[in-house]
Regions:
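Membrane-interface extramembranous regions at the lipid-water interface
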Residues: 1-60, 139-160
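Hydrophobic alpha-helical transmembrane segments in multi-pass membrane proteins
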Residues: 14-31, 57-87, 111-137
Length: 160
């Protein structure tokens, strides 16, 4: 990218980064709209090609990190709200004759017990991912509109 970058390239690159906010209006808009803009213009403009890859790689990485945090939080969430879910005595053959005696109830005294600590930390991690996504997308939009090359941090290079 040693040649001069035209205003059209800068605007198109900034639009690719800003279009990731379309996820708030269109399901998977943060992938679809940047992908369409990038594929339509990647052969003509090297700067647009670079920024399209950056935006898509960052959005895929953010999705992967969010899924990972969500998967880690499932056992803590289920273990807290449904503490007897892993108690297999209720499903033993010896209890088959007493199916009317099974009582499912929630203990509200221990609703916010120590199991909430990991759930809260994972909730904070999910919030941090969301905030990082917004901040770095805004920074990328501004930097590319100024003609600077922007690299997202903590991005896995899925598209090279």
């Amino acid at each position: 990218m040693t040649e001069t970058i035209t205003k059209h390239e800068r605007n198109l690159s900034a639009l690719i980064h800003a279009s990731t906010f379309s996820k708030f209006f269109i399901p998977f808009g943060n992938f679809i709209i940047p992908l369409v803009l990038w594929t339509a213009n990647k052969k003509e403009y090297e700067f647009v090609d670079h920024n399209g890859k950056q935006a898509l790689n960052f959005q895929i990485s953010i999705l992967l990190y969010s899924i990972l945090v969500g998967m880690i939080s499932i056992p803590f969430f289920l273990g807290g709200f449904l503490p007897n879910i892993f108690d297999f005595d209720n499903f033993a053959l010896s209890n088959m004759h007493s199916f009317n005696n099974i009582n499912f109830s929630f203990d509200t005294d221990d609703l916010f017990g120590p199991w909430m600590i990991p759930v809260a930390l994972l909730g904070l991690a999910q919030s941090a991912i969301f905030i990082v996504n917004i901040i770095y997308t805004i920074l990328a939009t501004i930097k590319t509109n100024e003609g600077e090359v922007f690299e997202y941090p903590l991005t896995i290079k899925f598209i090279k």
